[in-house]
Protein backbone atom coordinates (compact mmCIF):
# COMPACT_ATOMS: atom_id res chain seq x y z
CA UNK A 1 0.00 0.00 0.00
CA UNK A 2 2.84 2.39 0.82
CA UNK A 3 4.55 1.80 -2.52
CA UNK A 4 1.24 2.17 -4.34
CA UNK A 5 0.66 5.50 -2.59
CA UNK A 6 4.16 6.71 -3.47
CA UNK A 7 3.66 5.61 -7.08
CA UNK A 8 0.33 7.43 -7.29
CA UNK A 9 1.83 10.66 -5.91
CA UNK A 10 4.82 10.50 -8.27
CA UNK A 11 2.57 9.76 -11.26
CA UNK A 12 0.28 12.64 -10.31
CA UNK A 13 3.17 15.10 -10.04
CA UNK A 14 4.58 13.89 -13.35
CA UNK A 15 1.18 14.29 -15.02
CA UNK A 16 0.79 17.84 -13.75
CA UNK A 17 4.31 18.74 -14.88
CA UNK A 18 3.77 17.37 -18.38
CA UNK A 19 0.43 19.13 -18.78
CA UNK A 20 1.76 22.46 -17.50
CA UNK A 21 4.80 22.46 -19.78
CA UNK A 22 2.95 21.43 -22.94
CA UNK A 23 1.80 24.06 -25.40
CA UNK A 24 -1.49 22.26 -26.11
CA UNK A 25 -2.25 20.25 -22.97
CA UNK A 26 -5.00 17.66 -22.81
CA UNK A 27 -6.07 18.80 -19.35
CA UNK A 28 -7.25 22.40 -18.96
CA UNK A 29 -6.27 23.60 -15.48
CA UNK A 30 -8.36 26.72 -16.04
CA UNK A 31 -11.38 24.56 -15.29
CA UNK A 32 -10.49 24.92 -11.61
CA UNK A 33 -11.02 28.68 -11.86
CA UNK A 34 -14.77 28.17 -12.18
CA UNK A 35 -16.45 28.43 -8.79
CA UNK A 36 -19.23 25.98 -9.62
CA UNK A 37 -16.65 23.40 -10.69
CA UNK A 38 -14.75 23.77 -7.43
CA UNK A 39 -18.01 23.41 -5.51
CA UNK A 40 -18.83 20.29 -7.50
CA UNK A 41 -15.51 18.64 -6.67
CA UNK A 42 -15.90 19.54 -2.99
CA UNK A 43 -19.47 18.24 -2.77
CA UNK A 44 -18.51 14.98 -4.48
CA UNK A 45 -15.63 14.54 -2.07
CA UNK A 46 -17.84 15.06 0.98
CA UNK A 47 -20.51 12.76 -0.44
CA UNK A 48 -18.21 9.84 -1.18
CA UNK A 49 -16.38 10.09 2.13
CA UNK A 50 -19.64 10.08 4.09
CA UNK A 51 -21.02 7.35 1.85
CA UNK A 52 -18.37 5.05 3.30
CA UNK A 53 -20.67 4.87 6.32
CA UNK A 54 -22.57 2.22 4.35
CA UNK A 55 -20.20 -0.24 6.02
CA UNK A 56 -22.22 0.15 9.25
CA UNK A 57 -25.00 -2.09 7.94
CA UNK A 58 -22.60 -4.81 6.76
CA UNK A 59 -20.59 -4.75 9.98
CA UNK A 60 -23.69 -4.85 12.16
CA UNK A 61 -25.39 -7.65 10.25
CA UNK A 62 -22.16 -9.64 9.93
CA UNK A 63 -21.00 -9.31 13.54
CA UNK A 64 -24.22 -8.76 15.46
CA UNK A 65 -26.55 -11.03 13.44
CA UNK A 66 -24.03 -13.51 11.98
CA UNK A 67 -25.45 -13.13 8.47
CA UNK A 68 -23.68 -14.46 5.40
CA UNK A 69 -22.64 -12.52 2.30
CA UNK A 70 -25.78 -13.50 0.38
CA UNK A 71 -28.09 -11.99 2.98
CA UNK A 72 -25.96 -8.84 3.11
CA UNK A 73 -26.14 -8.59 -0.68
CA UNK A 74 -29.92 -8.97 -0.50
CA UNK A 75 -30.06 -5.93 1.75
CA UNK A 76 -28.09 -4.00 -0.85
CA UNK A 77 -30.88 -4.55 -3.39
CA UNK A 78 -33.07 -2.16 -1.40
CA UNK A 79 -30.81 0.66 -2.55
CA UNK A 80 -32.61 0.53 -5.92
CA UNK A 81 -35.79 1.68 -4.19
CA UNK A 82 -33.90 4.53 -2.58
CA UNK A 83 -32.44 5.59 -5.92
CA UNK A 84 -35.92 5.57 -7.45
CA UNK A 85 -37.40 7.67 -4.64
CA UNK A 86 -34.47 10.07 -4.76
CA UNK A 87 -34.71 10.42 -8.53
CA UNK A 88 -38.43 11.18 -8.50
CA UNK A 89 -38.04 13.63 -5.61
CA UNK A 90 -35.13 15.38 -7.33
CA UNK A 91 -37.06 15.85 -10.57
CA UNK A 92 -40.17 17.10 -8.76
CA UNK A 93 -38.29 19.57 -6.55
CA UNK A 94 -36.23 20.82 -9.50
CA UNK A 95 -39.40 21.48 -11.48
CA UNK A 96 -40.73 23.44 -8.49
CA UNK A 97 -37.66 25.67 -8.69
CA UNK A 98 -36.10 24.75 -5.34
CA UNK A 99 -32.60 26.20 -5.01
CA UNK A 100 -29.64 23.88 -5.38
CA UNK A 101 -28.39 24.55 -1.86
CA UNK A 102 -31.56 23.21 -0.27
CA UNK A 103 -31.47 20.11 -2.47
CA UNK A 104 -27.85 19.49 -1.51
CA UNK A 105 -28.76 19.98 2.15
CA UNK A 106 -31.60 17.46 1.73
CA UNK A 107 -29.14 14.92 0.34
CA UNK A 108 -26.82 15.24 3.33
CA UNK A 109 -29.87 15.20 5.60
CA UNK A 110 -30.84 11.75 4.33
CA UNK A 111 -27.28 10.51 4.82
CA UNK A 112 -27.45 11.80 8.38
CA UNK A 113 -30.84 10.17 8.97
CA UNK A 114 -29.40 6.84 7.84
CA UNK A 115 -26.55 7.21 10.35
CA UNK A 116 -29.02 8.24 13.07
CA UNK A 117 -31.13 5.15 12.37
CA UNK A 118 -28.06 2.96 12.80
CA UNK A 119 -27.15 4.77 16.02
CA UNK A 120 -30.45 3.83 17.66
CA UNK A 121 -30.80 0.44 15.96
CA UNK A 122 -27.38 -1.05 16.77
CA UNK A 123 -27.97 -3.40 19.68
CA UNK A 124 -27.59 -7.03 20.58
CA UNK A 125 -31.19 -7.85 19.57
CA UNK A 126 -31.37 -5.98 16.26
CA UNK A 127 -33.79 -7.15 13.56
CA UNK A 128 -32.67 -8.08 10.05
CA UNK A 129 -35.93 -6.79 8.54
CA UNK A 130 -35.25 -3.27 9.82
CA UNK A 131 -31.84 -3.02 8.16
CA UNK A 132 -33.42 -2.19 4.81
CA UNK A 133 -34.47 1.24 6.07
CA UNK A 134 -30.98 2.78 6.47
CA UNK A 135 -30.09 1.39 3.03
CA UNK A 136 -33.14 3.05 1.44
CA UNK A 137 -32.63 6.35 3.28
CA UNK A 138 -28.93 6.55 2.40
CA UNK A 139 -29.59 5.71 -1.26
CA UNK A 140 -32.22 8.43 -1.45
CA UNK A 141 -29.75 11.02 -0.21
CA UNK A 142 -27.07 9.75 -2.58
CA UNK A 143 -29.42 10.16 -5.54
CA UNK A 144 -30.10 13.76 -4.58
CA UNK A 145 -26.41 14.59 -4.62
CA UNK A 146 -25.32 12.28 -7.44
CA UNK A 147 -27.79 13.73 -9.91
CA UNK A 148 -27.61 17.39 -8.93
CA UNK A 149 -23.89 17.97 -8.36
CA UNK A 150 -22.90 17.63 -12.06
CA UNK A 151 -25.95 19.66 -13.10
CA UNK A 152 -24.92 22.47 -10.79
CA UNK A 153 -21.18 22.29 -11.52
CA UNK A 154 -21.48 22.45 -15.30
CA UNK A 155 -23.78 25.49 -15.45
CA UNK A 156 -22.55 27.81 -18.21
CA UNK A 157 -19.29 25.85 -18.37
CA UNK A 158 -17.43 26.33 -21.67
CA UNK A 159 -17.43 23.20 -23.80
CA UNK A 160 -13.63 23.12 -23.94
CA UNK A 161 -13.55 22.25 -20.23
CA UNK A 162 -15.84 19.23 -20.56
CA UNK A 163 -13.11 16.57 -20.79
CA UNK A 164 -11.16 18.17 -17.94
CA UNK A 165 -14.29 18.25 -15.76
CA UNK A 166 -15.05 14.59 -16.47
CA UNK A 167 -11.46 13.55 -15.74
CA UNK A 168 -11.29 15.37 -12.42
CA UNK A 169 -14.82 14.44 -11.42
CA UNK A 170 -14.17 10.71 -11.95
CA UNK A 171 -10.86 10.96 -10.11
CA UNK A 172 -12.48 12.58 -7.09
CA UNK A 173 -15.70 10.55 -7.12
CA UNK A 174 -14.33 7.10 -7.96
CA UNK A 175 -10.74 7.12 -6.64
CA UNK A 176 -9.72 9.77 -4.12
CA UNK A 177 -12.82 10.23 -1.98
CA UNK A 178 -13.86 6.53 -1.75
CA UNK A 179 -10.32 5.42 -0.90
CA UNK A 180 -9.94 8.12 1.75
CA UNK A 181 -13.40 7.41 3.17
CA UNK A 182 -12.90 3.64 3.28
CA UNK A 183 -9.48 3.97 4.90
CA UNK A 184 -10.80 6.50 7.41
CA UNK A 185 -13.83 4.47 8.47
CA UNK A 186 -11.95 1.14 8.54
CA UNK A 187 -9.05 2.46 10.61
CA UNK A 188 -11.28 4.34 13.02
CA UNK A 189 -13.53 1.30 13.42
CA UNK A 190 -10.55 -0.90 14.23
CA UNK A 191 -9.11 1.62 16.67
CA UNK A 192 -12.41 2.14 18.51
CA UNK A 193 -13.04 -1.60 18.53
CA UNK A 194 -9.71 -2.20 20.27
CA UNK A 195 -10.52 0.62 22.69
CA UNK A 196 -13.81 -0.96 23.71
CA UNK A 197 -12.30 -4.47 23.89
CA UNK A 198 -9.74 -3.19 26.39
CA UNK A 199 -12.40 -1.28 28.28
CA UNK A 200 -14.85 -4.17 28.56
CA UNK A 201 -12.21 -6.83 29.26
CA UNK A 202 -11.03 -4.99 32.38
CA UNK A 203 -14.21 -5.92 34.25
CA UNK A 204 -14.47 -9.50 32.98
CA UNK A 205 -12.83 -11.90 35.45
CA UNK A 206 -13.82 -14.62 37.86
CA UNK A 207 -14.91 -11.97 40.37
CA UNK A 208 -17.63 -10.81 37.97
CA UNK A 209 -20.79 -12.83 38.78
CA UNK A 210 -22.28 -13.02 35.28
CA UNK A 211 -18.96 -13.55 33.50
CA UNK A 212 -17.89 -16.19 36.01
CA UNK A 213 -21.20 -18.07 35.75
CA UNK A 214 -21.10 -18.02 31.94
CA UNK A 215 -17.47 -19.16 31.93
CA UNK A 216 -18.07 -22.07 34.30
CA UNK A 217 -21.21 -23.10 32.42
CA UNK A 218 -19.26 -23.24 29.16
CA UNK A 219 -16.47 -25.25 30.82
CA UNK A 220 -18.94 -27.77 32.21
CA UNK A 221 -20.73 -28.03 28.88
CA UNK A 222 -17.47 -28.76 27.06
CA UNK A 223 -16.48 -31.37 29.64
CA UNK A 224 -19.87 -33.06 29.25
CA UNK A 225 -19.09 -33.33 25.54
CA UNK A 226 -15.89 -35.23 26.29
CA UNK A 227 -13.37 -32.39 26.21
CA UNK A 228 -10.46 -32.31 28.62
CA UNK A 229 -10.39 -29.67 31.33
CA UNK A 230 -7.72 -27.64 29.53
CA UNK A 231 -9.61 -27.78 26.24
CA UNK A 232 -12.83 -26.79 27.99
CA UNK A 233 -11.12 -23.82 29.66
CA UNK A 234 -9.61 -22.69 26.36
CA UNK A 235 -12.94 -22.91 24.56
CA UNK A 236 -14.70 -21.04 27.38
CA UNK A 237 -12.07 -18.29 27.19
CA UNK A 238 -12.51 -18.10 23.42
CA UNK A 239 -16.28 -17.85 23.84
CA UNK A 240 -15.91 -15.05 26.39
CA UNK A 241 -13.49 -13.20 24.12
CA UNK A 242 -15.92 -13.54 21.22
CA UNK A 243 -18.76 -12.00 23.22
CA UNK A 244 -16.54 -9.10 24.23
CA UNK A 245 -15.48 -8.54 20.61
CA UNK A 246 -19.09 -8.48 19.45
CA UNK A 247 -20.09 -5.98 22.12
CA UNK A 248 -17.02 -3.84 21.38
CA UNK A 249 -17.78 -3.82 17.66
CA UNK A 250 -21.39 -2.79 18.24
CA UNK A 251 -20.27 0.02 20.55
CA UNK A 252 -17.73 1.21 17.97
CA UNK A 253 -20.34 1.21 15.20
CA UNK A 254 -22.77 3.14 17.40
CA UNK A 255 -20.14 5.75 18.25
CA UNK A 256 -19.07 6.17 14.61
CA UNK A 257 -22.70 6.48 13.52
CA UNK A 258 -23.10 9.35 15.95
CA UNK A 259 -20.04 11.15 14.61
CA UNK A 260 -21.24 10.57 11.05
CA UNK A 261 -24.54 12.23 11.96
CA UNK A 262 -22.66 15.29 13.23
CA UNK A 263 -20.57 15.35 10.03
CA UNK A 264 -23.73 15.26 7.90
CA UNK A 265 -25.26 18.10 9.91
CA UNK A 266 -22.09 20.13 9.39
CA UNK A 267 -22.23 19.46 5.63
CA UNK A 268 -25.89 20.52 5.58
CA UNK A 269 -25.06 23.87 7.15
CA UNK A 270 -21.96 24.23 4.99
CA UNK A 271 -23.77 23.78 1.66
CA UNK A 272 -26.49 26.24 2.71
CA UNK A 273 -24.20 29.09 3.79
CA UNK A 274 -21.87 28.87 0.78
CA UNK A 275 -22.14 31.84 -1.61
CA UNK A 276 -23.72 30.45 -4.77
CA UNK A 277 -23.55 32.26 -8.12
CA UNK A 278 -26.89 33.66 -9.16
CA UNK A 279 -28.69 31.81 -11.91
CA UNK A 280 -30.07 33.69 -14.88
CA UNK A 281 -33.02 31.71 -16.11
CA UNK A 282 -34.01 32.08 -19.75
CA UNK A 283 -37.69 32.73 -20.37
PLM region descriptions:
Residues 1-2:
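Phenylalanine-glycine-rich, low-complexity intrinsically disordered regions
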Residues 10-11, 110-120, 266-273:
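Transmembrane-helix signature of multi-pass solute transporters
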Residues 11-22:
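Structural signal for alpha-helical transmembrane segments and their membrane-water exit/capping regions
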Residues 19, 61-62, 153:
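Hydrophobic alpha-helical interface/terminus motif in multipass membrane transporters
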Residues 22-23, 121-126, 158, 193, ...:
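Short helix-capping/hinge motifs at transmembrane helix termini and TM-loop junctions
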Residues 24-148:
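Transmembrane core module of solute transporters
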Residues 131-211:
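Small-residue-rich alpha-helical segments with characteristic i,i+4
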Residues 174-276, 282:
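Hydrophobic transmembrane architecture of multi-pass small-molecule transporters
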